């Protein structure tokens, strides 16, 4: 139901009265925090936050995340409407415009990573990522999807369009495969925990052996429709596996996947020196995908094998939206 207040706020936006809208956002959020707590307050004020993040000049929009309004007024990294407010902002302005304005470190980092996903090269002039995640997409990160599919496409008055990336996307190019006996599960692998954190709606296992043995641990049948893909074509769905609710953005997925790849490669650097090791891992990795007949609308069935260390990780999950 559209209320008088909605019409009033829309009229203020149409007139470019953004300071008044920011004040309304802050007052509404602070009052809701006092009345009901942080989470309900964030949900209540998110539509107005989306409007400001999408349409206001960047000098004002970044103030959604500033603490100068007082307790309860600040949008956090989890505040979202159709998607995180910081991601809405990041899709609207270049890093050159936003870098001098953004202060909070968590928001700043996620906005920078979003701009990287959208094709910006921040490897010169931007502060290094605290975990050493590169500020320029590797060729294998960019190859498997169009720029428009990497981040939600937000709409001015709320809502967003997003690509639903799944593995396998179809049966095309796959064939009948008889999986071998499943390998023995290995526990305590940091890479396994990192992959589980990436896709917390899926099951993750690690085995010593090739990718099909890892797949056999989670596949519902020893006879599957499956095949191999280059990692560049697997990468987009792995990034999007982390974006399962509106409070998370594609930057979360890229950061989580890089953590997993660093662990799989056995790299230890946090200053970007591990990129060569990750690139080498990606070049040698064998990725086996398989189809499950009961797959939900969102599904991920892939096994990632590193032949250099003889380990393989399977990630398998399915859910309806």
Please place each PLM-identified region on the residue numbering.
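Short acidic-glycine loop/turn motifs at beta-strand connectors
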Residues: 306-309
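Internal, hydrophobic cores of structured domains that mediate oligomerization or house catalytic pockets
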Residues: 66-190, 315
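Long, positively charged binding patches that form subdomain-scale interaction surfaces
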Residues: 170-294
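Short, solvent-exposed aromatic-acidic interface loops
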Residues: 317-321
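Short, surface-exposed coil-to-beta transition loops
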Residues: 295-302
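An N-terminal, globular interaction/scaffold subdomain
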Residues: 2-122
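Generic detector of well-ordered alpha-helical segments enriched in charged/polar residues
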Residues: 10, 19-23, 45, 49, ...
